[in-house]
């Protein structure tokens, strides 16, 4: 995995989020919670990566685009296409769930998007103990090592 991914993750440290939607705190803490929930729910390292990097666009605000679009653009070429797609669409089921399900019904990744949405919504604890960024990175590195596939 490209070391640039770790930099994108660490850039979330201290990125404030609206307390109404994110009582847990900054974007890094939230992303680590989503990652931990994903790890408990699946052995799929691509879904772990989508969980960990779903909000990386929040560290690079853009007046023209939303954080899901910015994040997907940042991840393009660094992670598999499936991860980019999940990051790009991770808010679709929040914004317009029925429309998103219709639009993506033929996509084989829709069930993964549903899971990512659930994990994202569940990761709101201000007291959760999380994996450290370095440990999350190491787990992804290990799972993406061809010897572990």
Language model segments and positions:
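Short secondary-structure junctions and interdomain/linker hinges
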Residues: 12, 16-19, 41, 45, ...
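Acidic/His-rich, divalent-metal-binding segments that scaffold phosphate/diphosphate chemistry
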Residues: 1-63
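Charged substrate- and nucleic-acid-binding regions of tRNA-handling and nucleotidyl-transfer enzymes
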Residues: 110-149
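Alpha-helix initiation and N-capping motif
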Residues: 2-6, 46, 80, 109-110, ...
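Divalent metal-dependent catalytic cores for phosphoryl transfer on phosphate-bearing substrates
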Residues: 37-125
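Generic structural signal of hydrophobic/aromatic residues within well-ordered alpha-helices
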Residues: 5-12, 103, 112-113, 136, ...
């Amino acid at each position: 995995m490209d070391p640039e991914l770790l930099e994108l993750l660490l850039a979330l440290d201290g990125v404030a989020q609206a307390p109404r939607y994110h009582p847990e705190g900054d974007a890094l803490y939230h992303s680590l919670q989503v990652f931990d929930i994903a790890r408990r729910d699946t052995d799929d390292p691509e879904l772990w990566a989508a969980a960990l990097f779903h909000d990386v666009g929040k560290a690079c605000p853009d007046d023209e685009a939303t954080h899901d679009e910015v994040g997907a653009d940042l991840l393009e070429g660094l992670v598999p296409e499936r991860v980019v797609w999940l990051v790009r669409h991770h808010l679709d089921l929040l914004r317009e769930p029925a429309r998103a399900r219709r639009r993506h019904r033929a996509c084989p990744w829709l069930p993964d998007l549903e899971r990512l949405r659930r994990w994202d919504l569940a990761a709101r604890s201000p007291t959760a103990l999380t994996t450290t960024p370095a440990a999350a990175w190491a787990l992804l590195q290990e799972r993406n090592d061809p010897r572990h596939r």
